[in-house]
UniProtKB/Swiss-Prot annotation:
Domain of life (superkingdom): Eukaryota
Signal peptide: 1-22
Protein's UniProt keywords contain Acetylation: no
Protein name: Uncharacterized protein KCNJ5-AS1
Keyword Nucleus: no
Major localisation: secreted
Keyword terms, alphabetized: Glycoprotein, Secreted, Signal
Lineage: Eukaryota, Metazoa, Chordata, Craniata, Vertebrata
Gene it is expressed from: KCNJ5-AS1
Region called Disordered, residue ranges: 103-145
Pfam families found in the cross-reference section: DUF5570
C-alpha cells in the first residue's frame, strides 16, 4: 500500500526563455518522516515535465516559468514504501549566474538529520501502518489532483 501525497509548488521566473531549469526542494512537516536529502524519488504529475535525480536533496525539473508543479515524493523505509506530508516548497530558478529562491524554509532540515537513524523504527512503532496526518496537501482517497 502506498499513500500518495501531492504538493503544489509555484515557480516564477524573470528569465527570457519560456522554460527554466529549476530545482525543487521540500521541507517536511511530519516528524516521523526523514529529511528531504534521503528522499530519492520525486515524481511530477499532471504536467508535461522531465525530472531526474539530483543527489538526494532535490530533483531537477523542466517546467514553464510560473507554472504550478505537482509532485509525489516516496521513499523506501527498509521494505516499506512511505510518503511524506509536505507544507513548503522552494522553487529555485537557475540561471547562468545565480540561483534565486522564491521562498525559503530549509532551516529545520539540519535538525531533522539527526533523527534519520531511528526514523524507520519510529515510523513502524508509532504509526504501525502507512497512515499519515491529514494536511492541506494530502488528497482524499482518490488520485492526485
Amino acid at each position: 500500500m502506498l499513500t500518495r501525497l501531492v504538493l503544489s509548488a509555484h515557480l516564477s521566473s524573470t528569465t527570457s526563455p519560456p522554460w527554466t531549469h529549476a530545482a525543487i526542494s521540500w521541507e517536511l512537516d511530519n516528524v516521523l518522516m526523514p529529511s528531504p536529502r534521503i528522499w530519492p524519488q520525486v515524481t511530477p504529475t499532471g504536467r508535461s515535465a522531465s525530472v531526474r535525480s539530483e543527489g538526494n536533496t532535490s530533483s531537477l525539473w523542466n517546467f514553464s516559468a510560473g507554472q504550478d508543479v505537482h509532485a509525489i515524493v516516496t521513499r523506501t523505509c527498509e521494505s516499506v514504501l512511505s510518503s511524506a506530508v509536505y507544507t513548503h516548497g522552494c522553487g529555485c530558478v537557475r540561471s547562468a549566474t545565480n540561483i534565486t529562491c522564491q521562498s525559503s524554509g530549509q532551516q529545520r532540515q539540519a535538525a531533522r538529520q539527526e533523527e534519520e537513524n531511528s526514523i524507520c523504527k519510529a515510523h513502524d512503532s508509532r504509526e504501525g501502518r502507512l497512515g499519515y496526518p491529514l494536511s492541506a496537501h494530502q488528497p482524499g482517497s482518490g488520485g492526485p489532483n
